[in-house]
UniProtKB/Swiss-Prot annotation:
Reactions this protein catalyses: UMP + diphosphate = 5-phospho-alpha-D-ribose 1-diphosphate + uracil
Xref: CDD domains: PRTases_typeI
UniProt: uracil binding residues: I194, G199, D200, A201
Cofactor remark: Binds 1 Mg(2+) ion per subunit. The magnesium is bound as Mg-PRPP.
First-level EC class: transferase
GO MF terms held by the record: GTP binding; magnesium ion binding; uracil phosphoribosyltransferase activity
One GO BP: uracil salvage
Protein name: Uracil phosphoribosyltransferase
Native organism: Lactobacillus gasseri (strain ATCC 33323 / DSM 20243 / BCRC 14619 / CIP 102991 / JCM 1131 / KCTC 3163 / NCIMB 11718 / NCTC 13722 / AM63)
Length: 209
């Protein structure tokens, strides 16, 4: 089964508290979501492989390290996942960005895919799905399934807050996918919101209702 990791770095926890507050405005919310995304991917990528390369500094020749192995693609689940992308790209500017568009039926809470766009070599890349919320796990599982259907083999999931029910759903449906969260919250409410959560991340990012 894939591992579930809470990235409890003090800066991540501090910034998460700010965006949880109901009086945090759109601009600050948007900025900090991006910052947390960058901090999370920094922690998540500690196991990326390195290789030796010969370079020449202004002083002379030297053997140094650079990234090896599979290239990365960041996959936000639209629309809320977009808020995490800029922070991730500040850490990994060379990463490609794919997009999966989904909406959730407010009655059934079931996700529906309406858009999918990826780099052509998706099967050769490591995919990091980003989405602020892991609630029921429905959207995450659909996104993972859509990537696997197109040939992706290496997938990780990064979320800001996760409900235990969502973590369980993803682990059962996709035991080969590792999940990373800034925090695991208490529970999933009957209306599909995470408690205590941070509200509707998409609306708070873009100033909509």
């Amino acid at each position: 089964m894939g591992k579930f990791t809470v990235l409890n770095h003090p800066l991540i926890q501090h910034k998460l508290t700010i965006i949880r507050k109901k009086d945090t405005g759109t601009n600050e919310f948007r900025q900090i979501v991006g910052e947390i995304g960058g901090l999370m991917v920094y922690e998540m990528t500690r196991d990326l492989p390195l290789k030796n390369v010969e370079i020449e500094t202004p002083i002379g020749k030297s053997t140094q390290k650079e990234l090896a192995g599979k290239k990365l693609v960041i996959v936000p689940i639209l629309r809320a996942g977009l808020g995490m992308v800029d922070g991730v790209l500040q850490m990994i500017p060379s990463a490609k960005v794919g997009h999966i568009g989904m909406y959730r039926d407010e009655e059934t809470l079931k996700p529906h895919e309406y858009f999918f766009k990826m780099p052509p070599d998706i099967e050769e890349r490591e995919c990091i799905i980003v989405d602020p919320m892991l609630a029921t796990g429905g959207s995450a599982n659909m996104a993972i399934g859509a990537l696997k259907k197109r040939g992706a083999k290496n997938i990780r999931l990064a979320v800001l807050v996760a409900a235990p029910e969502g973590v369980k759903a993803v682990q059962e449906a996709n035991p080969d996918v590792d999940i990373y969260a800034a925090e695991e919250d208490e529970k999933l409410m009957d209306n599909g919101y995470i408690y205590p959560g941070l509200g509707d991340a998409g609306d708070r990012l873009f100033g909509t209702k």
